[in-house]
Amino acid sequence: MTNIVIAGYVPGAIGRITELHATYYGSHWDFGLFFESKVASELSEFLRRFDPERDGFWTVIRGGCVEGSLAIDGAQAETEGAHLRWFIVSDAIRGQGAGNRLMEEAVGFCRRKEYPRIFLWTFKGLHPARHLYEKFGFRQVDQVEGEQWGKQVLEQRFVLALR
């Protein structure tokens, strides 16, 4: 974890985070244009309406390059829960603790904001991510066949109750 910094938004973050998602999920899960454009548009929309009193956004920087990210969308935090999104760590630093640090930042942020819960959507087969979610106390509460990422997968909803 030497030379790795956890930061917020930096110029180029939207493009790089989109690239990380598109290349990882494209090569491992055959996700394509629909997924990449969804990440780009939804991340852009989130950052345009970003409110630091409500939302969290963290990047992992190494050598001046974005190598990971995680966001907390707090727009529906009091009703639906805080939405954990765009969690990814590049192959270059995967397994070095950056994902753990991002999760610590996000969960700590939500606790300080006294949000009732954090939720996320993922899909079956992402074992390292699931392990990390469960390490932080998230529990799977739903599983359904779906195509929200442009390809049929077994979507899973995880929730961490905070109060």
Label every PLM stretch briefly:
Residues S90-Q96, K124-G125:
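Active-site acidic-Proline motif in GNAT/NAT acetyltransferases
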